[in-house]
Amino acid sequence: MAPSHAVRCCQRGLSWIPVIFINLVVCWSYYAYVVELCIYTIPNVNEQVIYLVVFHAFFFMFMWSYWKTISSKPTNPSKEFCLPKAEKELYEKEERPEAQQDILKRVARELPIYTFTGSGAIRYCDRCQLIKPDRCHHCSTCDKCVLKMDHHCPWVNNCVGFSNYKFFVLFLAYSMLYCVYIAATVLQYFIKFWTNQLPDTHAKFHVLFLFFVAAMFFISILSLFSYHLWLVGKNRTTIEAFRAPVFRNGPDKNGFTLGFRKNITQVFGDQKKYWCLPIFSSLGDGYTFPTRLVTVDVEHGNIEHQTIKCTVDGQTNARPLSESQNHLLCNDEGQKDSSMAAIEVCQPVCVTLENES
């Protein structure tokens, strides 16, 4: 027990090395730009002031978003998703996978669970001993289940998920702007030092190296930022991009796609004034998520992904799943309610549900 605890402590200590490295590079870049470039190299005072004001604006936003990404604790599933004591004992005693799934299905009927494993089973974490909410995954590094997990990032030593994904995207954006601003403003002095138009001073090394480092980081961050912008536009996580979520009717990589504008608001919120600020404004609670509409066949309980129209008295309406009293795991009860609704209006009714995961 003691050796494993010691190893765990060493791993936690070593996991901060990338964060320390990034902070050392940022501290050096701050010194090189403010002191060696602006104070010792740039002769014009007005140019110094303009460079410093804009630089500190980017630096502040970059550090703010970086700190929020690091410090935001990943949200974990609530006790509601843990098995009750009686069911847990039955589950642990049962050796047959089919019987274990029956136990999980009974518990999952009361939970907003709409995604499954590749084999159609309830997603259960044996490590955390809970039923995984939709889009929730277990992080082997943090040893916890994380809501809407995207990935574990060593550069922030934290899991990127529902609680801090917006901060992570902003961190990439502002770090990219920070690098491109430094490279653009340093370029003319880089050329002057390189061509010996300026005398050799202690600032020469800092200015030359600062340009190379800023350009290198900009190029590497640009590809990662572009990829995550694409993910935001598709309303996918990195995990979902590699492994499509499985709904009742099978895998669907576009299961959570709502349209470009709505996809963006899922991450950044519906108030644009907060989009550029590392302030939490993402929509939802991390447990349930709106998805494309699905049709429930009243007669057979079949579910099909498509654009749904619910026609009652000639009117077309769409009803979100959160407003429905039926879970996808409770087909019998849902079919009864839907059938009664069809009888009352004296015509076929297509019940519309918005799948949440």
Curated annotation (Swiss-Prot):
The chain crosses the membrane at residues 15-35, 51-71, 167-187, 205-228. It catalyses: L-cysteinyl-[protein] + hexadecanoyl-CoA = S-hexadecanoyl-L-cysteinyl-[protein] + CoA; L-cysteinyl-[protein] + tetradecanoyl-CoA = S-tetradecanoyl-L-cysteinyl-[protein] + CoA; L-cysteinyl-[protein] + octadecanoyl-CoA = S-octadecanoyl-L-cysteinyl-[protein] + CoA. The keyword Cytoplasm applies. One of its GO terms (molecular function) is metal ion binding. Its EC number is 2.3.1.225, 2.3.1.-. PROSITE patterns: DHHC (PS50216). The keyword Metal-binding applies. Residues 123-173 form the DHHC domain. Keywords: Acyltransferase, Cell membrane, Cytoplasm, Endoplasmic reticulum, Golgi apparatus, Lipoprotein, Membrane, Metal-binding, Palmitate, Phosphoprotein, Transferase, Transmembrane, Transmembrane helix, Zinc. One of its GO terms (cellular component) is plasma membrane. It holds the Pfam family DHHC. It is a multi-pass membrane protein. It is found in: Golgi apparatus membrane; Cell membrane; Cytoplasm, Perinuclear region; Endoplasmic reticulum membrane. The active site is at C153 (s-palmitoyl cysteine intermediate). Residues 1-14, 72-166, 229-357 are cytoplasmic. Palmitoyltransferase that could catalyze the addition of palmitate onto various protein substrates. Catalyzes palmitoylation of Cys residues on protein substrates and has a preference for acyl-CoA with C16 fatty acid chains but may also utilize acyl-CoA with C14 and C18 fatty acid chains. The DHHC domain is required for palmitoyltransferase activity. Belongs to the DHHC palmitoyltransferase family. This is Palmitoyltransferase ZDHHC20-A.
